[in-house]
Structure formats: structure tokens, C-alpha cells
């Protein structure tokens, strides 16, 4: 058998797996000929050209076959949540979770894959590619001494299972505050309606103590003010409770 045929034989035993470059090299290293071959990247390149590896992003591949003609929507539907879980574990182990709009959508049984997802972690700010053209907006919270607050925020989460993978999901109150802080102009109307829907449905369980805790940290005062204004349109009693918390622990913006 040729070198390429030997590597294809190895891959065919791992169809459907997602491998990063190191894992792929390690897998191919089980072939004696590859242990002596220094330029492994060349065989990876040829395997990609022949349809045995589908690139999800730089140095991350789906093991597939030339007969399988994937569309990007199919790939996303089957593998997005697996790739997201793998990315989070590789970067931050278990100190991260889903926040903002997607966290609230998931609570309303909406698992559609958005162009971007917000992830709170203890280290990074910025943007990370998840796969294909889908990105993660990264956010970290620090105190005045620049110390990470991730351990404090990780007290307020729920565990959910999506696509066979477990994720930590921000409490709805935290998700709402981040939505009000970070919502784009294009999504504002949609986000506001989603917040109203959640709060009307779960009025009795709304956690005012969690809002108080956030204000005491010196975080999200503007979001709590926006929430008060939004709630005022459908529930004045709840709005007054929020107003009292703002005046007690921070300040009104008007």
C-alpha cells in the first residue's frame, strides 16, 4: 500500500471524529512509515484535497469520506455544539459559560446557531472562531484590582445538555443584563421582546437578590437601569423594586 492509502485506512476507522492537528498527527503516528516521515503536514494536505478531512477551522478537522458531500448547514447542525464544547474545554477547562442572548434563547428552547455567541470566561476578551464562519465573543469580569471574578459568577449557572454535550448556562437574570448591555441595534427589538416574554412568564421566580449582588460588585448599573425602564412598560411593581435596588446600591441614570 502507498503512504496515502495507509493513512486513509487509519482515518476510515475514525469516521465522524473531530480532531485537532496534534490529535491527527498522533493518530497517523500509529503507522510505522509516518513515524519516520517528518513532513506530516503534506499528507494532511493531500487527505484534505481528496475529501477525507473537512476543515472546520485552522488546525481542526472532521474525519469524513469523499462520498459524503457536506453542506455547511449540515456540518453546523451536527457538529457546532461539539466543537464549541471542545473549544471551551481546551481554552479554559470548566471555567466558562454561555451568557447573553443565546443563554436566554436556550431557556426558551431555541437552539438555533447564531453567527456569534457570547462566552464568559476567566481569562480572555476578544473574538474566537468557533468553526466555519461562526464566532464567539469572549468576555471576562474583573474587580478593581484586575482580579478575575469568574469564580464568583460561576456560582450562578445551570447545566444544560445540547447535542450530547453539557454546558454551563448563565442564570436568566445575568443573561438579561448582558443582553441589555451588549445588544446590537439590529437585535434590540428582538432582545427586548425576548426579555419581556421571559419576565412575564417567570415573574414569581425573578431573582432580585442576584440583581442586588451584581450592583454591589459595581457591575451592570446601566443594564439594570435599562431593565427598569423596560419592565415599567408592563409591570410597575417589578420596576419599582428594581428602582429601589438601584437607588440603594448604585445610582439612577436620570
Residue ranges and their predicted role:
Residues 29, 48, 108, 181-185:
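Hydrophobic/aromatic-lined pockets within catalytic cores
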Residues 152-254:
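Hydrophobic alpha-helical interaction segments
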Residues 41-44, 49, 57-58, 88-127:
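Short helix-loop-helix/strand-helix junction enriched in hydrophobic and basic residues
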Residues 127-128, 133-168:
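Glycine- and acidic-residue-rich phosphate-binding/metal-coordinating active-site segment common to enzymes
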Residues 27, 34-37, 94-97, 113-117, ...:
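Short glycine- and basic-residue-enriched patches
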Residues 81, 92-99, 109, 157, ...:
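Cationic, amphipathic, low-complexity alpha-helical segments enriched
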Residues 2-94, 205-207, 211-225:
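Short beta-edge/loop segments at beta->alpha junctions of small alpha/beta modules
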Amino acid at each position: 500500500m502507498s503512504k496515502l492509502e495507509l493513512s486513509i485506512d487509519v482515518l476510515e476507522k475514525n469516521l465522524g471524529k473531530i480532531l485537532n492537528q496534534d490529535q491527527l498527527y498522533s493518530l497517523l503516528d500509529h503507522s510505522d512509515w509516518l513515524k519516520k516521515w517528518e513532513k506530516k503536514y503534506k499528507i494532511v494536505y493531500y487527505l484534505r484535497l481528496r475529501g477525507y478531512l473537512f476543515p472546520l477551522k485552522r488546525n481542526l478537522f472532521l474525519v469524513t469520506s469523499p462520498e459524503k458531500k457536506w453542506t455547511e448547514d449540515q456540518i453546523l447542525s451536527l457538529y457546532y455544539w461539539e466543537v464549541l464544547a471542545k473549544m471551551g474545554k481546551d481554552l479554559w477547562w470548566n471555567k466558562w459559560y454561555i451568557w447573553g442572548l443565546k443563554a436566554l434563547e436556550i431557556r426558551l428552547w431555541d437552539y438555533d446557531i447564531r453567527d456569534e455567541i457570547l462566552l464568559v470566561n476567566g481569562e480572555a476578551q476578544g473574538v474566537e472562531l468557533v468553526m466555519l464562519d461562526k464566532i464567539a465573543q469572549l468576555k471576562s469580569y474583573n474587580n478593581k484590582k484586575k482580579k478575575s471574578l469568574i469564580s464568583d459568577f460561576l456560582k450562578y449557572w445551570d447545566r444544560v445538555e445540547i447535542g450530547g454535550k453539557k454546558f454551563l448556562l448563565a442564570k436568566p437574570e445575568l443573561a438579561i443584563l448582558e443582553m441589555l448591555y451588549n445588544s446590537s441595534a439590529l437585535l434590540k427589538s428582538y432582545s427586548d421582546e425576548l426579555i419581556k416574554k421571559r419576565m412575564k412568564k417567570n415573574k414569581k421566580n425573578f431573582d432580585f437578590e442576584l440583581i442586588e449582588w451584581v450592583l454591589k460588585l459595581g457591575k451592570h448599573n446601566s443594564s439594570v437601569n435599562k431593565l427598569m425602564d423596560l419592565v415599567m412598560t408592563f409591570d410597575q411593581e417589578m420596576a419599582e423594586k428594581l428602582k429601589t435596588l438601584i437607588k440603594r446600591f448604585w445610582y439612577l441614570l436620570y
